[in-house]
Amino acid sequence: MSAPLTLALSKGRIFEETLPLLAAAGVQVAEDPETSRKLILPTTDPNLRVIIVRASDVPTYVEYGAADFGVAGKDVLVEHGGSGLYQPIDLNIARCRMSVAVPAGFDYANAVRQGARLRVATKYVETAREHFAAKGVHVDLIKLYGSMELAPLVGLADAIVDLVSSGGTLKANNLVEVEEIMSISSRLVVNQAALKLKRTALKPFLDAFERASQNGN
């Protein structure tokens, strides 16, 4: 019997919003990663298992063949690189946007016009660097791993670059969006070798995911 396919997912919103896609393929994950300590989860299909990894690590697991396919946000693929991966489907899940936000009352447009050098906190350093360089904005980028909204409140940064869904967290911390960098959704990513060597096993999942994503799950 051949080894099962391995699907790489991250905990949280991507995992939850991938479940209906798996259901469309007739598959359920046997355990909840929020309550289970296991990082390799069986499914109701003996030919598929799910591994739970950090969101930023999904492309790496897939690129090097530790997973045959996975689900990764556009933010992760742009920041960490997805050029070595086949990206056949925009799954239209985990939708949000990457934006620049500043404290309410801070005149961002005027600061940019005057050529001010801004300190910007973000975990998306490469994406932010490219964005500001393209606009000719002078910035010092500060790498953080979480709680971006805190940085302007304590004087660490003038602005942040982060993902925004409803904007509720920004509003609660007296921050406002001033610029959208890109729209974000999650993509299916597939290992290039697996696509050739395991195409027969992969195809039912790819087809089911594509149908479900087009039909709004």
Curated annotation (Swiss-Prot):
GO molecular function, one term: ATP binding
Function: Catalyzes the condensation of ATP and 5-phosphoribose 1-diphosphate to form N'-(5'-phosphoribosyl)-ATP (PR-ATP). Has a crucial role in the pathway because the rate of histidine biosynthesis seems to be controlled primarily by regulation of HisG enzymatic activity.
Catalyses which reaction(s): 1-(5-phospho-beta-D-ribosyl)-ATP + diphosphate = 5-phospho-alpha-D-ribose 1-diphosphate + ATP
Cellular localization per UniProt: Cytoplasm
Subunit composition and interactions: Heteromultimer composed of HisG and HisZ subunits.
Annotated EC: 2.4.2.17
Pfam families per record: HisG
Biological source species: Burkholderia vietnamiensis (strain G4 / LMG 22486)
InterPro entries: ATP_PRibTrfase_cat, ATP_PRibTrfase_CS, ATP_PRibTrfase_HisG, ATP_PRibTrfase_HisG_short
Main location: cytoplasm
Name under which the protein is recorded: ATP phosphoribosyltransferase
Family of the protein in this entry: Belongs to the ATP phosphoribosyltransferase family. Short subfamily.
GO BP annotation list: L-histidine biosynthetic process
Domain notes: Lacks the C-terminal regulatory region which is replaced by HisZ.
Pathway it works in: Amino-acid biosynthesis; L-histidine biosynthesis; L-histidine from 5-phospho-alpha-D-ribose 1-diphosphate: step 1/9
Keywords: Amino-acid biosynthesis, ATP-binding, Cytoplasm, Glycosyltransferase, Histidine biosynthesis, Nucleotide-binding, Transferase
GO cellular component, one term: cytoplasm
PROSITE patterns: ATP_P_PHORIBOSYLTR
Coiled coil regions, renumbered to chain: none
